[in-house]
Amino acid sequence: EMGLSDTQLGLLSGFSFAIFYVSFGIPLAKLADTWIRRDVIAISLTIWSSMTAVSGFAQNFIHLLLARIGVAIGEAGGSPPAHAMVSDIFNQEQRATALAIYSTGINIGILFGFLLGGWINEFYGWRIAFLVVGLPGIALAIFLKLAVAEPDRGMAEEKIDDGSAPKLKETLKHLWSRKSFRHLSIACGIHAFVSYGAGNFLPSLFLRLHDIETGELGTWLALSSVAGGVGTFMGGYLSDKLGKKDPRWYQWVPAITTLIYLPFTLFIYLTDQTYLALMTTFITGMLFNAYLAPNLAITHSLVGLRMRAMSSAILFFILNFIGLGFGPMVIGFVSDMINPTYGIESIRYALLIVIPISTLWSATHYFIAAKYIRDDLELAPK
């Protein structure tokens, strides 16, 4: 309807979102480390759900851009306080599994987003799709405020909360002094670069190069998000299971699954077999979602009680600045640059140029981070 270019689509889903997401993430995490985390989440959920619905009234690129900025500001206050609450309920040996279960909510959201969004777009248009996806979140925010209790900080580990939250500079200095965190945060950022970049343009790849309608594609991608949820859970579960004997598994699990992911995703980009490619997205979704929970769990294990929301925000700042900020934009830019030569095939070759190198780069940093995990955990606040 608006005739947006790949670069504009990349900006909407990537850089414009990321710059506000990361800018508001840290102050909202600071608020969560000092205030009631449940209320921070409820207010944030109301904002991003409302702005998602408002997107349905956009008349041009600028309107969509402003709505996406509103969504970004709201979402910035969601995960860090939620991660901190989960880490207070579950101890170090259970934490990755618990965070993985929480993180499957992302995949459930993708499931309903693709499933409802694809079919609603086909029959009623994209404007109605935004309204249907956005409005239920407001009701959920009210339920969260009324029905969910705020857990005591340090509850699972019987740690004493002294009530004072360190300053951002202190938390950042603490984390960056740990070599394991330096490398895992870079690995996560590049991982997200691949995930957001490829994920944002995968629907375009199928719609342009395969004979498939948006409703059917939405159903397939929704189902693949279920596999992503399985991968998220298994990443956390395996890390906790294997990490009891050797904490380096909290980095080896993301490293190994990332490497296994690569040949399968290359097959998706290269094949002309539509349904075989769609089925392969189940495998890639499962493998590439295994990274998040182990990295969140190990990050929380490296810091004190009132650093947890902030540590999540710092990790998400790096992850989203690199991943969401540049992933979709770079792939969209490369696609536009080679479009005069490759035409509608340009998105295929843009993915083939960018994704393999980035995937290998990410796995390398996971392996390096694993070398320092045991020593850094010994230095964690007791």
Predicted regions and their residues:
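Helix-breaking motifs and short loop linkers at transmembrane-helix boundaries and internal kinks
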Residues: G3, I36, F57-H63, G74, ...
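Central cavity-lining transmembrane alpha-helices of secondary-active solute carriers
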Residues: G14-L28, A222-G235
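Conserved MFS/SLC helix-loop-helix module at the cytosolic interface between two early adjacent transmembrane helices
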Residues: S23-I62
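C-terminal ends and interior cores of transmembrane alpha-helices
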Residues: T46-Q59, T258-D272
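Cytoplasmic helix-loop-helix junction between adjacent transmembrane helices
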Residues: A67-I108
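Helix-loop-helix hairpin linking two adjacent transmembrane segments in secondary transporters
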Residues: Y102-L146, E150
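Juxtamembrane intracellular "pre-TM" segments in multi-pass secondary transporters
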Residues: D152-S185, L209
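Extracytoplasmic gate region of multi-pass secondary transporters
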Residues: R178-G235, F288-L292, L296, L324-I331
